[in-house]
């Protein structure tokens, strides 16, 4: 398993809000409805979100927020008994059956393949 804390850029709730140009309450709402996932940092215990989970608007009016296909996958993993840490590690670590990280596969439009693997793991 990779060391996700070293391989990715992590943002606090306020940093994620600033990155997206939204209020911190929007980030907390996305965390509550499982559109986003955060883990306590091993360094300071503050909740942190991987920046790669976020979509920043490139121009006025563009979508900004969590990667839209993330929510269904996170719910599937939670329903299957994955802890938040296990779900985060799986999303950010290479999966042999996908040939990539599940997150990269989702970003590439391979939602069905990712959810099929997640469903099999959650059994």
Label each PLM-derived region with a short phrase.
Residues 1-123:
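Non-transmembrane "mature" sequence context
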């Amino acid at each position: 398993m990779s060391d996700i804390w070293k391989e990715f850029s992590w943002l606090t709730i306020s940093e994620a809000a600033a990155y997206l140009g939204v209020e911190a309450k929007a980030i907390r709402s996305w965390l509550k409805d499982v559109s986003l996932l955060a883990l306590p940092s091993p360094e300071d215990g503050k909740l942190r979100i991987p920046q790669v989970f976020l979509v920043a608007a490139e121009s006025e009016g563009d979508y900004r927020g969590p990667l839209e296909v993330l929510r269904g996958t996170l719910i599937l993993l939670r329903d299957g008994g994955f802890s938040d840490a296990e779900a985060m590690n799986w999303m950010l670590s290479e999966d042999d059956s996908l040939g990539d990280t599940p997150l990269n596969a989702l970003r590439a439009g391979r939602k069905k393949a990712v959810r099929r693997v997640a469903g099999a793991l959650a059994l």
